[in-house]
Every structure is written in structure tokens, then in C-alpha cells.
Amino acid sequence: MEEYLVPLDQYLAAGVHIGTQQKTKDMKKFIYRVRQDGLYVLDVRKTDERLRVAGKFLAKFDPESILAVSVRLYGQRPVKKFGEVTGAKAIPGRFLPGTMTNPQVKNFIEPDVLIVTDPRADHQALKEAVEIGIPIVALVDTENFLSYVDIAIPTNNKGRKALALIYWILAREVLYNRKEIESREDFKIPVEDFEMRIIRT
């Protein structure tokens, strides 16, 4: 078997495999087991596989035609950093209705592919992507549905460390598949740069 994109321990330490206590029929194929406390655990091998697939897929697009969004707080820095590193556009925070469908909207954009951090939280962006007929790459947890999702990356899509690691790997895969870096080891940006800072008051 091919090695993981990062050591298995790194995936587990970031909590990538930790799902929720709900599961949908759509996500059944990505679930490894259910814990005694009722929490569903995701199959990290499938996360790893899907990150490879998504990286190859996204590398085919012009960087500025990729849009990554996250309404979820812990996904906002990861999508912003993903944008900086890959040249993609990023909308961290609230997604204004009409951003992709109404040319009158101030920051109107016409992407060719959309990345959502959570199909449920990012439902407005998802809806507009469906309307304009562009492919959708989504980070999906055990309680998500896969309607309209073209490439699903099964992961904890709520955790701060999990989201940082997933977007870090995805950024590295995009650059690697574009041949902008010769090997994955050439990606020198620390994963911490993708992590949402917590400001204690």
C-alpha cells in the first residue's frame, strides 16, 4: 500500500478521524467504526485517498478560477492560507448571496470550481455553484449529505487542527500536481500557518 500523505499519527493527532454522533447514509462508506460513546470514526485511508484525488483534480484549473469558502470560524484561516499558497480565491466568513450568480454584487466572481469546508454551513455557496454548474469539492463529516458534491473529502470539518491539516495537505497536493514543487518535501510552509489562532482575553 502507498504511504499516507502525512504519517498516520499526524492525522490522528489533529483529530481528522473524529466524526460526530450522527451519520447519514451518504457517509456510511467513509465510516470506519462507531465508538462506545456513540461517536462515529472516519476511515483515514479514505481521507488520504480523496486528498490525492482532489489535489490532482484542482491542479488542472487556473489558480484564480478556484474558490475556497468557509463560514465556519475554524476554517477561515485555512481557506485564506490555501488561497495565498495556491493562488486560489478565498472567502473566509460570511458568503454574500449572489456572489457567483449576480453580476451586480460588489465582489461578484465566476469561479470554475468550488471548495466548501462544510456543505451544510456553506450551503449558500454550494447552492450557487449548483446553479452555475461548476464542480464542487467538499470536506464532509459523518453527518453531511453528498448531494451535488463531486469530490468528497471525509474529515472532521469542525476541528481547528483537523481543518488546518486538511487544507495544508490539499495546498501541498495542488502545488505538487502542478509541478510547482518537485517533491512533497519541498513544501516548506508549516502546518501551523494554516491554523486559526485562538485569542484568549
Swiss-Prot record:
Gene Ontology, cellular component aspect: cytosolic small ribosomal subunit
GO biological process, one term: translation
HAMAP family on file: Ribosomal_uS2_A
Record's protein name: Small ribosomal subunit protein uS2
Keyword check for Membrane: no
GO molecular function, one term: structural constituent of ribosome
Organism annotation: Thermococcus kodakarensis (strain ATCC BAA-918 / JCM 12380 / KOD1)
Gene3D superfamilies for this protein: Glucose-6-phosphate isomerase like protein, domain 1 (3.40.50.10490)
Stored SUPFAM superfamilies: Ribosomal protein S2
SUBUNIT field: Part of the 50S ribosomal subunit.
Family membership: Belongs to the universal ribosomal protein uS2 family.
The entry's keywords: Ribonucleoprotein, Ribosomal protein
